[in-house]
Amino acid sequence: MIGRIAGTLIEKNPPHLLVDCHGVGYEIDVPMSTFYNLPAVGQPVTLLTQLIVREDAHLLYGFGSAAERNTFRELIKITGIGARMALAVLSGMSVPELAQAITLQEAGRLTRIPGIGKKTAERLLLELKGKLGAELGHAPGTPAVPDSAVDVLNALLALGYSEKEAAAAIKQVPAGTGVSEGIKLALKALSKA
């Protein structure tokens, strides 16, 4: 297993890279989120990797963060989601955005990704529910699902509301609202529905 590559970036052609590591050039496919953060050609680069072995090829996928790689690994476990589709998902939205879409059960956000239809989006929501942990949903420097929103969601579920109802109510709560105030506002939104 090749878990990490450190070398010189020789070639960039989205989504493909060529990284020279002590005279050996590794072809690596990366999500666009990683691609946009790469250094210039000729500069050193370090990527976390995932090797996929198929009958006809050995494919190497690279990631700029452990959260991206972990999410990729979770995605390829899902029936009907191969490495290319997983790469498309990670290119279409950041890990925190994906975690938020999963937490709030927003299939519509997933269907905006090329190649993801309604059924695939619903399968992603079902299979990834509870699997994108705090380290994935709260990558430093990126917007994520606030802890308070997750707590409000859990409180509404504990009160017997469906996930769909709870997610819709949470959308009515302004970002940055505390848990107790968030629950009050969500319950108010639910009473009007």
UniProtKB/Swiss-Prot annotation:
Residue numbers spanned by region Domain III: 151-193
Chain residue ranges for the region called Domain II: 65-143
Coiled-coil regions listed: none
Keyword DNA damage appears in the UniProt entry: yes
Superkingdom to which the source organism belongs: Bacteria
UniProt GO cellular component terms: cytoplasm; Holliday junction helicase complex; Holliday junction resolvase complex
Family recorded in the similarity comment: Belongs to the RuvA family.
Name of protein: Holliday junction branch migration complex subunit RuvA
Taxonomic source organism: Cupriavidus taiwanensis (strain DSM 17343 / BCRC 17206 / CCUG 44338 / CIP 107171 / LMG 19424 / R1) (Ralstonia taiwanensis (strain LMG 19424))
